[in-house]
Amino acid sequence: AQETIDSGKRFRARELGIIIGNYPTGKYNAITDVAGVKIGHVTLISGSGKLVPGKGPVRTGVTAILPHGGNIWQEKVPAGGYILNGCGEMTGFIWMEESGYIETPILLTNTLNVGTVMDGVIDYMIKTVPEVGISDDTVNPIVAECDDSTLNDIQGRHVTQEMVLKAIESASDGPVEEGCVGGGTGMICYEFKGGIGTSSRVLPEKEGSYTAGVLVMANQGRRRDLIIKGLPVGKEITDLLSASRKGYGSIIIVVATDAPLTSRQLNRISK
């Protein structure tokens, strides 16, 4: 039987006939269409009802992005970036700009868990590169954040260092789980439920056949500003509104490509 929107399945835009952009997608329409890229999530969902700071409800997690399956410290990857505004924040950004590469996995989580997640990445790096900080340089982890405190007991800082290791070590290629998973578990987007999203596009052969993939942790926007293919969807869907959150939120966007680009060129792509 043909599936309907009421069937309980979560549809992706293209499954509903909404085609965005001019280029075809990769096999999975995900950042993992870029060869070597791996994604891992650890998702925390527990409790309900009124907020009890330090206890719950818990709606949070951590997402790991690995540029390849090898030793990232020994096989560094060219990188660039761009800051649209100060939130979300990202550790390791200055060193990435200065050096022109990344040398650790990229982790996404909530604002108050950044420190713990950094510790988890450092544990992972020491485990895989024992000479870090002894006979080799120290490490500057890349951890990006958004504020999930509307839905999550953010003061509880429920993500642990062990969960960070699990997200990194369980990362895989292939289809990417989206929505309320990993770092995106407690996020809100245009006053709908937000979270993790991903897509990819493949250039035609005459343009190099390169692949670009994107993964976002979406936690931004007011309902009235949501536009899809030129249609003011947010202004049409005026019900289903939850309690308003503080501010306008933020978004973290990670772009990967197999095109042979320098750090300067990657800076431009990130813009």
Model-derived features: where do they sit?
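Alpha/propeptide regions of enzymes that mature by internal proteolysis
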Residues: 2-271
